[in-house]
Swiss-Prot record:
Residues 1-28 form the signal peptide. It is found in: Cell membrane; Cell projection, Dendrite; Cell projection, Axon. The gene is VSTM5. This is V-set and transmembrane domain-containing protein 5. Residues 29-147 are extracellular.
């Protein structure tokens, strides 16, 4: 086999070098990106419940994680932190938020006003970022209303039972009183008849 001319060897070497450089650049760009996974994009909850807004991310280095809340009442920042450091929690959510190193947060004792959109932004130190949204619906606890109605009905039933018992007792007393009165009337009538007989 004849050796290739030196010009062809150079172009083949350059093209292989360019190919290797492109592969390395693609791998480098891929490793610098941020990926974010949200297992549950919509959460339904009831009042006073503790809610976990669960996410997972992957990136090189330590990112900055930020959660914001958006609803009919406006948009506000909830918390910002870097995993392994102390979180900067807003005043509106002090003592109501717990952060996790995987980017998740837990909201304690949610209310109807907590319904809305929760947006997480994960920003890598080189500037690339990724965001995701979780929708939270918080509804009133229906059984509390039913409990209130049940208590009122039980109270009314107890009052009705007491009234019926009082009516029964009053009826018995009235019956005894009438019986006594009839008996006295009978006695007085008998005495009158006897007196009339004696007078005659």
């Amino acid at each position: 086999m004849r050796p290739l001319p030196s010009g062809r060897r150079k172009t083949r070497g350059i093209s292989l070098g360019l190919f290797a450089l492109c592969l390395a650049a693609a791998r480098c760009l891929q490793s610098q990106g941020v990926s974010l996974y949200i297992p549950q994009a919509t959460i339904n909850a009831t009042v006073k419940e503790d809610i976990l807004l669960s996410v997972e991310y992957s990136c090189h280095g330590v990112p900055t994680i930020e959660w914001t809340y958006s609803s009919n009442w406006g948009t506000q920042k909830i918390v910002e932190w870097k995993p392994g450091t102390q979180a900067n929690i807003s005043q509106s959510h002090k003592d109501r938020v717990c952060t996790f190193d995987n980017g998740s947060i837990q909201l304690f004792s949610v209310g109807v006003r907590d319904s809305g959109y929760y947006v997480i932004t994960v920003t890598e130190r080189l500037g690339s970022s990724q965001f995701g949204t979780i929708v939270l619906h918080v509804s009133e606890i229906l059984y509390e209303d039913l409990h209130f109605v049940a208590v009122i009905l039980a109270f009314l039933a107890a009052v009705a039972a007491v009234l019926i018992s009082l009516m029964w007792v009053c009826n018995k007393c009235a019956y005894k009183f009438q019986r006594k009165r009839r008996h006295k009337l009978k006695e007085s009538t008998t005495e009158e008849i006897e007196l009339e007989d004696v007078e005659c």
